[in-house]
């Protein structure tokens, strides 16, 4: 009787799941430490790079109208007036946002009136200024009202200047609402308090950047 000897292949050692998880965790920790060290050594480079990655901007170009949305009276009507003087647009639309209690009492100027006065002082005639919408409450309702104006008036291109950090959200919202009905351009404008290369030195810049990141995510999820 012949004895049979069974041979087996050497067992292949596989890393345990726990070991692999530990390696991934350590790699992530190492990356975070290195990134933190780099940011500590060169914080301005990192912060400036973050702004460059976030900010999107269209070049101003001839358009049927320029729209001035709610807020940002320190820079939005100024940009619109500049485009008008350069002959890029002959019509400036002003968002008709809802009046605040103080505005209803006549203590404060309405958004439409305040922007209209700024535009006229910058050389834009009253005949070139037109309000759009009614009691608009946020960027999305402004985009919808602006789209309705464009369709009603046969507009093919509209420029909507906004600040550097809000440009990404506004650009996405306009493209989402307008579709292929008209071209929307969103030039990113520096607010008077900060620019892309020094935003972290100003409280409004810090708050503005973080708020816009959250708003952008909210808009993408909601709309």
Predicted regions and their residues:
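N-terminal intrinsically disordered, acidic low-complexity segments at the extreme N-terminus
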Residues: 1-10
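A transmembrane-helix-recognition feature enriched in membrane-embedded lipid enzymes
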Residues: 202-223
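Structural signature of transmembrane alpha-helix termini at the membrane-water interface
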Residues: 37-41, 80, 217-221
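Alpha-helical structural elements
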Residues: 33-35, 49, 194-195, 211-214
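N-terminal type II signal-anchor transmembrane helix
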Residues: 9-56
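A structural signal for short, hydrophobic/glycine-enriched beta-strand patches
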Residues: 12, 42-201
């Amino acid at each position: 009787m012949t004895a049979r000897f069974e041979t087996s292949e050497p067992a292949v050692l596989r890393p345990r799941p726990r070991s692999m998880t530990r390696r991934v965790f350590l790699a992530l920790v190492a990356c975070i430490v290195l990134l933190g060290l780099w940011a500590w050594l060169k914080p301005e480079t990192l912060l400036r790079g973050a702004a460059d990655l976030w900010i999107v901007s269209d070049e101003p170009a001839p358009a049927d109208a320029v729209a001035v949305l709610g807020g940002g009276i320190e820079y939005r009507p100024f940009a619109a007036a500049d485009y008008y003087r350069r002959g890029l647009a002959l019509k400036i639309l002003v968002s008709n946002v809802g009046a605040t209690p103080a505005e209803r009492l006549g203590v404060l100027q309405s958004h439409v009136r305040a922007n209209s006065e700024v535009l006229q002082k910058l050389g834009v005639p009253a005949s070139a200024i037109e309000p759009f919408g009614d009691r608009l409450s946020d960027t999305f309702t402004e985009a919808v009202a602006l789209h309705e104006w464009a369709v009603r008036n046969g507009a093919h291109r509209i420029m909507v200047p906004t600040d550097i950090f809000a440009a990404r959200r506004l650009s996405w919202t306009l493209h989402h609402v307008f579709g292929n009905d008209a071209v929307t351009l969103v030039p990113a404008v520096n607010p008077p308090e900060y620019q892309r290369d020094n935003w972290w030195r100003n409280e409004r810049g810090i708050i503005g950047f973080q708020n816009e990141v959250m708003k952008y995510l909210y808009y993408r999820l909601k709309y």
